[in-house]
């Protein structure tokens, strides 16, 4: 279980609040969508959970251990097991989808593999299996500059899974995608949660959150204003955003 306790973050000399005492518990295999207006703290919360940003108060507890009190090794373990997918995935556009998946992210892959691109045969087969699971087997040998935005998002997801991600934090993964591509990405996420017990926390438009997520967090002005099971929101809940 993952516990977020009183997570609070301010910015600037005037200490403008970005996150206001966020409290939540997350269970394995949940597909959580964060919704809210622009500037409500959605991306900031994701980046804090990924340890890409710090916070002033509160704690992130994973498996009973406070991450910030677990030292360098604890933080590195989390960064290996948690993947942060930005809106525009950092892929090498001159390499194939398969190579991007195999080489992985810095911090997860030995330096010699990052430089040479050399891989073991079992790694190759594992990557091909994941690409097949995500509907990308026919794109494995295509360079990433030839792929659509939705396909690139799935390549980034495959890369995270091949390198051991148990939690995926995805910042607006369907922004700019056509409806069919967006649905394909989110169906992939939902399948990973239900079949592989991967935990996914992502920022989504409200209508997509209602369709695909198993749980919805509503943020407004840095405050968690509701935490509900995935369904259509009531008008009263929408009014909180």
What are the residue ranges of the model-derived segments?
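Conserved ABC ATPase "signature" region
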Residues: 114-139
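Helix-to-loop junction immediately C-terminal to a conserved catalytic motif
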Residues: 50
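ABC ATPase NBD coupling module
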Residues: 67-83, 120
């Amino acid at each position: 279980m993952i516990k977020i306790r009183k997570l609070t973050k301010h910015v600037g000399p005037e200490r403008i609040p970005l996150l206001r005492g966020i409290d939540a518990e997350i269970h394995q295999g949940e597909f959580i969508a964060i919704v809210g207006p622009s500037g409500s703290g959605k991306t900031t919360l994701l980046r804090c959970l990924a340890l890409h940003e710090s916070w002033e108060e509160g704690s992130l507890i994973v498996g009973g251990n406070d991450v910030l009190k677990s030292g360098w090794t604890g933080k590195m373990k989390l960064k290996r097991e948690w993947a942060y997918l930005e809106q525009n995935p950092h892929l090498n556009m001159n390499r194939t989808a398969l190579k991007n998946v195999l080489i992985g992210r810095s911090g997860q892959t030995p330096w010699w593999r990052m430089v040479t691109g050399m891989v073991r045969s079992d790694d190759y087969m594992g990557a091909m299996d994941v690409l097949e699971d995500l509907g990308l087997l026919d794109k494995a040998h295509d360079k990433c500059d030839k792929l659509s935005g939705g396909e690139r998002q799935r390549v980034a997801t495959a890369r995270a899974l091949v390198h051991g991600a148990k939690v995926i934090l995805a910042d607006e993964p369907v922004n700019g995608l056509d409806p069919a591509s967006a649905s394909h990405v989110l169906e992939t996420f939902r399948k990973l949660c239900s079949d592989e017990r991967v935990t996914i926390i992502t920022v989504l438009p409200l209508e997509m959150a209602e369709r695909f997520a198993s749980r919805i967090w509503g943020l407004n002005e840095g405050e968690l204003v509701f935490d509900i099971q995935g369904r259509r929101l009531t008008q009263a809940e929408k009014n909180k955003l």
